[in-house]
Structures are given as structure tokens and as C-alpha cells.
Amino acid sequence: VIFGALARYAFVILSWYSKGSIITVVLQVTCGLGSEVEREVIPMIEDETYRGWHAMAPKLEDDSIAETTLTGESLLENPLLNKGSAFTEAERRELGLLGLLPPHVATMEQQLARTYENYRRKTSDLERYIFLASLQDRNETLFYRLLQEHIREMSPIVYTPEVGEACENYSHIYRRARGLYISYPQRDDIETILRNASHRHIRVIVVTDGERILGLGDLGLGGMDIPVGKLALYTLCAGIHPATTLPIMLDTGTNNPTLLNDPLYLGWRHERVRGPAYDAFIEAFVRGARNAFPDAVLQWEDFAKDNARRLLDRYREDVRSFNDDIQGTGAVTLAGLLAAMDVVGSTLREQRIVALGAGSAATGICEQIVAAMVGEGMTQRDARAAIWLVDSHGLVHDGRSDLDASKGIYAQPNDRVAGWEIATPGHFSLEDVVRAVHPTVLIGTAALPGAFSETIVREMARRTQRPIIFPLSNPTVKSEAAPADLIAWTEGRAIVATGSPFADVIYDGRTFQIGQCNNMFIFPGVGLGVIASGARLVTNSMFVSAARALSACSPARSSPGQALYPPLEEVRTVSRRVALAVAAAAVDEGLAEPLAPPDLDARIRETMWEPRYASVRHVTRQ
């Protein structure tokens, strides 16, 4: 034991000298990476050395010590270290905090009670969002503990649906910068900007250009709250330490005239950059991110349809990256369908699926369904033929000349629609398709409120004993139908999941729980699984594995009337199971170190951070 400890100390010391430069890692233990070596030898080393020697360090039961050079008000301004009134008397003396805080030393429970009391005083969801954002900027540990305690109440505030309103008002409620902003005029400074990030050991990056924010369209720089919110969910749901996350806004302009004419707009006041110039900008960003943060998982978020699929396909083989709008939405929807199959006692290959909306979310859902059907023994051609895609111009079929590649693969042959009775010649509406196809599954991603009309739903229910209906559009006002209507129009036979949160439905004396088809059940676990396994790439099969892991957690499988998706209170357990499935898939594909499931699970558990206060110690910069 003594020899091993001496060897580790020697390794660290030699690493310092070999690197030729020294930096201070001020937050080593609160990142959940504590070890005896880290506490005894202050890690003043560059990231590559840190990664190299940390793997040799023994994991201790107590990860509760953080060392920092910060003191006084500078320490209180650091949200990752600040404990506010919870700093102990000894810490206040050591860290230069005497007199800077009220004399009472509070417990976290007291802080939580006070904070929640103030939160409840807010009279609008936007005020609640601002309150929580301010708490995050002041004390991240308390912020995440509060979210854990009230996840069902607060997750719709920190992310969908309320984050949409926050994005729309971003330049008017802006208080403090978080993450990195890279505007097109700064394209020659991308590497410099990336190296200005507050932390070097970044594990997850979420990046957007703000062009397609939820169902709200082009919100320019205001889209920055999407990466911020997504990364908050990575921490809340999967325990990814906030110091290892980085939100990034790629500001390539905006075509939103309201923003361009707003005197308070904080973004680059210019029409959006397109074509080769845009592609070169993205290429420079990806290259810079890969150099600055070689171990990070890159998540593309809320890019417009024309770019989302193209960028995913362009970079998925080069960097560990995925698009949650495409792959995450597809996986979480597939999980709900798999759970519904258990409820109705059927299989995917027996379904007739109609999907309204043909954007990146819809095609991502179709892609995951096809992959699962192929896994059940269908050919890819037959699987695609079971899906009837309807966009703003009607049914996607061979007779149309306006189809891009992502839609074209789902185009139905003309002979399958010949002879249909349709209301408008040459146009196959959603109602026409439902009447002719007799779908068993109806999915909506078109952000058209009321699109699933009573006529359409009753027609579907007339032909299908247990219609499966997923109105998935966000925010709530964009939902294709209200669950209460769907339950009533089908006499209580519909199996419903929604994209936005809805209350339980009481019909004919029975209570129907409405599960939220929420990506937060998928993407945090995917990121955690990739990080813990060290997978070199993120693949579609990992998302199918994630979907199957999530479907296994469905309450509806064992109890009629229960939701298709687990309660949000169980999301950390779900994320761990999803992560294990993803890590195992990475091993099976030869993309990660060949570890057995128990070893992968141990890595996953070690990676997950819990929001609890560390004991803060002052150290002197060498």
C-alpha cells in the first residue's frame, strides 16, 4: 500500500515537470472524482496528465472535500463552490468569509425550505424560470438539490415547455452569461473562444444555432437557453457534474424580423448565413471543439430541418455526436410504442403507423421504429411501407416531386393509394389517410393544435380496438390534441402519451395517467453511457438499446391505466439503466473497452454526481 501511494505521488510530480506548465484545478472533488491522491497532492496539472493519473487513483467512500485558491467574495461568486449560509464557522475563518455572511450556519434543508418558499411566491412561470436561473448562477449544488426534491413541479420550468417563453424573451430577461457564444464575425477566433471556457475537463457539449427552437421557430441568440436547459437535465437526470458541461450558441444571424428590430436584442443583427459559408463555420467549430475537448460528447440541438440531418450525417463518424431532436425523440417514442405493444399484446411488425409531420423529429421517430421492426425480422423495405408519413402537403408518396431524401425513403408507391376516395383531388389529407389505412398508431409532431380532430380520432377508433395516439408537439399549446378529448372520443380505449405534461384524465369513473414522451428519459442516459464506457462513437443501435431499456421501466406493462412512461421521480434510476444498455451496446459494437455489465454499471455509478455540499479548503497557488 505504501509503495503504491509513493508511486502515485511520484507519477504526479513527474507529470508536473514533464508538462512544462501548471494550472490549478480548483474543483477536483466536487466533480465526483475525488481520491486520496487528489486531496493530498493538489492537482495543478493539465487535463491530459489529469486523465492519465486519475485512473490510477483509488476511489474513496468520502468525496466531500474541495480545494480552491478562491477566498472572500470571489469564492461566493463561484456557483460551483458557493454554499452561501451553509459555510461552517471554520470554513468562514479559513476562506476569508467572516462578516460576509449572516452569522447563522444553515443546513441545506433550511436553505431548501427558504428557497422553495421564495419560489412559490412567484406568480408566473417566466418569473419562476428567472428565479431558478438566478439560483443556478449563485449556488449550483442547491439548485440541483432543489430540482431533485421537486422534479415534477420544476422540470417543466427549467426545460419544456417554459424554456420556450424564456428563449423568446432572452434578451429582455438576460442577467448573466452562461456557456460560450460564438458569432459568425468571430469565426477566426473559434479556438480562442473555446479555450476561454471556465473548465477544461468538458464531458458534454450541447450546441445550437437557434434556428428551430422547439415549435417556435427562429429565435436567434435566444436559443441559448435550450443548451443551458438540456445540460441542466444531464446533471439532474444522469448525474453529469455541471463543471463538465458546456452550452454553446453558434450565432449565425437570424431571419426573425422581430429580433432584428428589437433594440435590446443581444445577438448578431444580420440575416442568417447560408451555404458554404455556414458549412465552413460549422466545420471550424467542430474542429476546434475536437481539439479543445477531445473527450466530450457533442449534442446537436434545435437546428433547422435542412441542417439537422445533414450535420448529424456529416459528423457522426468523426466525433462522438448525436442529435437529440432526431435520435433522442425517435428513441423515446419507440420506447413508448414498445411499452404499448406489451399492453395490447402485439408487436411492432403488426402495426399500421400514421405520422403527422415530416421534420427531423418525425423522420427520426420513423428511423428508430424501422430499426426496431427490422430487429423483429422485417425487411427494411417492409418496415418503411408500414409507415404512412403526412406533411403539410399531404401524404408522402411517389407522385410528389418535392420530397427530400429523408422523406423520400418513406414515400408510398402510387399503386397503394390508387382508388382512394379523397376530398381534394391530388391531395391526400390526414383524414383521407386515416380513413384508408385504418392505422393502429397515430403520431403527431407537426405542432398543429387540433390536428387530431374528433372526426379523425373516432374514425381511427372505429377500426382499432386499442388506438395508440401520441400527440408529441411542444409546447402544450402546439399539441395535436388534448388527452382528455382523446380518451373521451375513444370511449376510454386509447393509449395516450404526449410531448408536453398533462394532468391525469378521469373518464367514466376511471383514472388514466398520461405519460410524457419526454426526451429527458433518453438523452441524459445516452450521454452517461457513452462517457462511462468511453465509446468512440454514438450509433443508432445505442438508441434502440436505450429505447428497450426505457420501455422495460414502463408502469403500464404491469398495471392497466398507468402511464406508458415512468414517473419523473424515477428518472435517475431510469437514466442509469439506459446508460448501462448504451454502454453494453458500445461494447457489443467494438466501440468501447470490452467490460462485463457489472463493471460497466460500476463505472456508471462512479460517474454520477450527487448534489451535496463539499467541505471547502483553501490552498495556496504554487
Give each language-model segment a name.
Residues I45-S321, A585, P611-Q622:
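N-terminal ligand-binding/catalytic initiation module
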Residues L81-N82, F322-G328, M341-V344, P467, ...:
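Adenosine-phosphate binding glycine-rich loop
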Residues T244, D295-E301, T347-Q351, E376-A385, ...:
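Flexible, glycine/charged-enriched surface loops at secondary-structure junctions
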Residues N323-V441:
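Glycine-rich phosphate/diphosphate-binding loop of Rossmann-like nucleotide-binding domains
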Residues G426-E491, G534:
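Long hydrophobic segments that form regular secondary structure
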